[in-house]
C-alpha cells in the first residue's frame, strides 16, 4: 500500500460510514459514562464493516512500536517526546494495542467523514496483531524493542512471534531495531531501510546471559555455538558464532557512556558522521536502570529518525516532562520509608526476573510484596493462569539477606510459595495474604528501609491500594 493509498484508505462505502458513525457514538457514550472501554468503538465498527481498518483514512505518517518487553513504556515515552516537540499526534494510549484498539483510536482521531484530524499516528502494536494490522496500515517506521519468551499460553515461544512479525512487515517500512538483541535485529530482511541502536559495554555487564533460562543459546543462522562477549540484560548484549561468524549488526546510534549518579548518558550518532567524526549528544534519564535506558534510547532513536533534532530532544528530556510512566514505576515515601511499586508483566519470566533484580539491587533492608497473579483473570471461573512460568523466573533474587520479608498475594499464592521455597527463600520470611489490604497489614515495618511491590500490569489499582494502606499504617504509628 502506497502512502497515498494509506492516507485515503480503500473506497469508503455506506457500510463504512455506518460503522464510523456507530463507533463514534460508542466512544461518546463511553466518555459520558466515564468508562474507558478502549476497544469498544473499534469492535462495533468492525462488526458492521469487517474491513474497517482498510477503509478508514490514515494520518500522513504512521509509527508503530512492538516487541515483547517495554513496548508500552517505550511507546508512551515516544508519544510524550513527539508531543513536546510539537507534532500533531494520535496515539492508542486510551485504546489498546490490538486491531480493535487501533481502530478505536483512529475513530476518535477522525472527523465525521473519516478524515484524520492528526498528521502523525504513533501507536503500540501487539506482536501477534502485526498480521492483522500491517496489511491495512503500513507504518513509515516500525520500532521493535526486543523479543523474549512471553505468556506461554498465548505467545508460545520467541521463534513463533518472530515468524509472525517477520512475515508481516512491508518492504517499504523503515525498521528501527535493537542491535543488542540477536533475535529481533534479524527481523524482516525484505525491509531494506534499517536503523540499529546499541549500548556499548558497561562496567557492570555480565560475561553471559543472566538468569536460569536463556532465549538464545545457539546461533540463529546456523545453529552453531554462540559465544557471548558481554550481556547487559538477559540475552541482550554482544555475541558471535564460533562456526559461521554471525554477530551483532553495526549500530547507527551507540550509547558510549552512562553516568548513573548524574543520571545522564551519551549517544554517538555513527550514521551522522562527517569526515570520520560522529556527533555525540548527552541526555538526561529520570530514573536509571538498564531497562529504562533501553526504552528511552529506543524512543530517542525513533524520534531522531522522524527528524527531531538532537538538541530539541536534549531540551525535552532536561525539562523533566518526559519520564517512565507512573503506571510502570512509581515511588513515594512515608516518614523516610521508601514505598516503591514496580510493574511486572504477569506470565512473563523475563519481565518478572528483571523487576526482581532491580528491586533486590536497591540499597537497604526491604520487604517485598508479590502481586503477580492476574486479578481479573482470577475472577473468571472458566479460566486459569499457567503457573509453569514461575520456574523460568529468577525468584532466587529474593533469597538475599537484605530481603527481610516476602509477602505473596493473589489467587496462586500456594504455587508461588512452593517456587519461593525451591529458590531458597527462608520460609520464616514468607507470608501469604488474601487481599492487598491483608498484604499491607502483614508487613513488619520494623527494621526495614523500604517496601517494594512487584505487581502484574493488570493489578495497578490493587498495588495502589496496597501502598495507600502501608502509608496509612506508617503515618498512624
Task: Please state what every model-predicted region is.
Residues 2-31, 36-38, 216, 223, ...:
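ATP-dependent carboxylate-amine ligase
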Residues 4-218:
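Phosphate-binding loop of NTP-binding sites
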Residues 60, 122, 148-336, 418-421:
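Acidic, Mg2+-coordinating active-site environments of NTP-dependent enzymes
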Residues 68, 96-97, 288-290, 307, ...:
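Short, surface-exposed acidic/glycine-rich loop or hinge patches that mediate macromolecular interfaces
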Residues 74-75, 131-133, 153-154, 186-188, ...:
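Short glycine-/acidic-enriched loop or helix-start segments at secondary-structure transitions
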Residues 78, 82, 102-106, 296-306, ...:
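Buried hydrophobic packing segments
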Residues 95, 126, 180, 288, ...:
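Short beta->alpha junction loops/turns
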Residues 110-115, 273, 362-363, 395-398:
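Alpha-helix termini
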Amino acid at each position: 500500500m502506497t502512502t497515498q493509498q494509506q492516507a485515503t484508505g480503500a473506497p469508503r462505502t455506506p457500510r463504512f460510514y455506518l460503522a464510523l458513525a456507530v463507533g463514534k457514538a460508542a466512544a461518546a457514550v463511553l466518555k459520558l459514562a466515564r468508562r474507558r472501554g478502549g476497544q469498544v468503538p473499534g469492535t462495533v465498527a468492525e462488526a458492521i464493516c469487517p474491513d474497517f481498518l482498510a477503509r478508514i483514512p490514515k494520518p500522513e505518517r504512521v509509527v508503530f512500536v512492538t516487541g515483547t518487553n517495554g513496548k508500552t513504556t517505550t511507546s508512551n515515552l515516544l508519544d510524550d517526546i513527539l508531543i513536546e516537540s510539537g507534532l500533531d499526534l494520535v496515539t492508542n494510549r486510551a485504546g489498546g494495542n490490538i486491531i480493535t484498539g487501533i481502530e478505536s483510536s483512529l475513530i476518535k482521531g477522525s472527523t465525521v467523514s473519516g478524515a484524520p484530524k492528526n498528521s502523525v499516528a504513533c501507536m503500540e502494536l501487539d506482536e501477534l496483531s502485526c498480521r492483522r494490522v500491517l496489511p491495512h496500515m503500513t507504518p513509515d517506521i516500525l520500532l521493535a524493542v526486543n523479543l523474549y519468551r512471553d505468556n506461554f499460553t498465548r505467545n508460545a515461544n520467541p521463534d513463533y512471534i518472530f515468524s509472525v512479525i517477520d512475515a508481516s512487515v512491508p518492504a517499504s517500512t523503515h525498521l528501527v531495531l535493537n542491535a543488542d538483541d540477536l533475535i529481533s535485529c534479524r527481523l524482516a530482511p525484505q525491509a531494506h531501510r534499517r536503523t540499529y541502536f546499541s549500548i556499548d559495554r558497561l562496567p557492570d555487564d555480565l560475561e553471559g546471559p543472566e538468569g536460569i533460562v536463556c532465549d538464545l543459546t545457539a546461533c540463529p543462522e546456523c545453529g552453531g555455538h554462540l559465544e557471548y562477549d558481554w550481556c547487559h540484560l538477559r540475552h541482550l548484549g554482544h555475541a558471535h558464532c564460533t562456526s559461521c561468524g554471525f554477530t551483532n549488526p553495526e549500530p547507527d546510534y551507540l550509547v558510549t557512556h552512562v553516568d548513573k549518579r548524574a543520571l545522564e548518558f551519551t549517544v554517538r550518532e555513527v550514521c551522522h558522521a562527517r569526515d570520520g567524526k560522529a556527533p555525540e549528544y548527552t541526555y538526561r534519564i529520570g530514573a536509571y536502570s538498564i531497562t529504562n535506558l533501553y526504552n528511552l534510547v529506543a524512543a530517542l532513536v525513533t524520534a531522531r529518525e522522524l527528524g527531531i533534532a538532537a538538541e530539541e530532544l536534549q531540551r525535552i528530556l532536561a525539562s523533566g516532562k518526559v519520564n517512565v510512566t507512573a503506571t510502570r514505576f512509581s515511588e513515594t515515601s512515608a516518614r523516610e520509608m521508601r514505598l516503591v511499586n514496580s510493574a511486572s508483566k504477569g506470565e512473563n519470566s523475563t519481565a518478572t526476573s528483571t523487576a526482581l533484580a532491580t528491586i533486590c539491587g536497591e540499597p537497604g533492608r526491604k520487604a517485598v510484596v508479590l502481586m503477580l497473579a492476574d486479578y481479573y483473570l482470577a475472577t473468571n471461573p472458566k479460566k486459569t493462569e499457567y503457573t509453569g512460568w514461575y520456574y523460568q523466573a529468577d525468584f532466587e533474587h529474593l533469597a538475599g539477606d537484605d530481603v527481610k520479608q516476602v509477602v505473596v498475594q493473589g489467587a496462586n499464592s500456594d504455587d508461588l510459595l512452593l517456587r519461593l521455597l525451591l529458590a531458597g527463600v527462608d520460609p520464616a520470611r514468607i507470608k501469604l495474604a488474601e487481599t492487598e489490604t491483608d498484604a499491607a497489614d502483614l508487613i513488619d515495618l520494623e527494621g526495614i528501609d523500604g517496601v517494594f511491590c512487584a505487581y502484574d500490569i493488570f493489578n495497578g489499582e490493587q498495588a495502589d491500594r496496597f501502598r495507600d494502606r502501608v502509608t496509612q499504617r506508617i503515618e498512624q504509628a
